[in-house]
Amino acid sequence: MVKVNGFSFVARSAGIRKSGKPDLGLIFSTVPARCAGVFTTNKVQAAPVLVTAPRIAAGECQAVLVNSGNANACTGEVGMQDALRCGQLAAKSLGIDEQLVAVSSTGVIGHPLPMPLLEKTIPGMSEGLSETAVDDVANAMMTTDSFAKVASRQAGDSAPYTILGVAKGAGMIHPNMATMLSFVMTDACVDQHFLQQALRQAVEGSFNIITVDRDTSTNDMVLVLANGESKTPEIVADSAEGQEFAELLRGVLLDLAKMIVRDGEGATKLVHVCVNGAADDGDARKVAYNVATSNLVKTAFFGEDANWGRIIAAVGYSEAQVDPSRIAIFFDGVPVVQKGLGTGPELEAQATDVLKQAEFSVTIDLGLGDGRGEYYTSDLTYEYVKINADYRT
């Protein structure tokens, strides 16, 4: 079990979820931690986002309280007061300033939090804090997720520290984040401004290159807390240590991001869409985005149909610079298109075998330049429709 110096965790069932499963998680640092955050781009933002964003912007955080089963979104002033009250209850239990508590929620939109249940449960949570209970918090965050999502990285021997992250998400997953929460804890000592910079870059190369269903939630947030309890020297920008930290942080977030796509509601495939040879990186990303989000492409993945026509059509409407006569498409290295033309039934049959795998790559070479881009996506299945048709019942 991975531990991070100075961090402890606890989860409880407050009764928000009908199933009776844990629905309330608490992350605590023994000392105030430097922090950074990235939040939903949705213009309709849930109360916990509105409460937490300015607290994170202040630069210090000591605890994160998260509930599942209720988003506390579109709940008006009552929702704001409820979010504030939850933070107050956690702060009092922990003996810290309420401004150091981040609050987060995920679940059904439009219903007020069941405050009597939370008033009863939150005050006693601090008594159960444990250095090894991170999996419990990851489980308490889940809604339609089928498994808990935890990832970690450790720095080298010269100045050792640990980065540990948890996440939830399976539906409403789309670039610029979606119904997706992630909390990252590290005992490294990191300059606060660099921490925000490193987080934004890591999110750009992880959570912002995944898609399940093109929906973006009201509640997304990614937070990182760095408490310095490893007692290693401060990590700053433009240094070898800073580069290592940024790479490790992205590694944790990318692991979590791929778990989210793998757990996409009803998903049976994890597909890595890679675009090479674009005029520039922006064009490459446009192409990867359009292929990864095409419902026709995603249903072909589910049907294990190497239907490259749907892919090349998505390339064509991406608004990227394209010369059809230069396009090549590969499934795990099997060429199905060369110079804009199909390579024939034998290679297409090999590509169909590739699509029977749970994970594979689709590589598109535009043959125009050095631009590169990527996305991770899932297939689109009957089960996705069923899960979301029944979500509130």
From Swiss-Prot:
Swiss-Prot/TrEMBL catalytic activity: N(2)-acetyl-L-ornithine + L-glutamate = N-acetyl-L-glutamate + L-ornithine; L-glutamate + acetyl-CoA = N-acetyl-L-glutamate + CoA + H(+)
Residues holding substrate: 143, 168, 179, 265, 388, 393
GO terms of molecular function: glutamate N-acetyltransferase activity; L-glutamate N-acetyltransferase activity
Protein name: Arginine biosynthesis bifunctional protein ArgJ
Pfam families linked to this entry: ArgJ
PANTHER family per record: ARGININE BIOSYNTHESIS BIFUNCTIONAL PROTEIN ARGJ, ARGININE BIOSYNTHESIS BIFUNCTIONAL PROTEIN ARGJ, MITOCHONDRIAL
Keywords: Acyltransferase, Amino-acid biosynthesis, Arginine biosynthesis, Autocatalytic cleavage, Cytoplasm, Multifunctional enzyme, Transferase
Positions of the record's site feature: Involved in the stabilization of negative charge on the oxyanion by the formation of the oxyanion hole: 106-107
One GO term describing the cellular component: cytoplasm
Biological processes, Gene Ontology terms: L-arginine biosynthetic process; ornithine biosynthetic process
Native source organism of the sequence: Syntrophotalea carbinolica (strain DSM 2380 / NBRC 103641 / GraBd1)
Presence of keyword Amino-acid biosynthesis: yes
Domain of life: Bacteria
Site residues (Cleavage), renumbered to this chain: 178-179
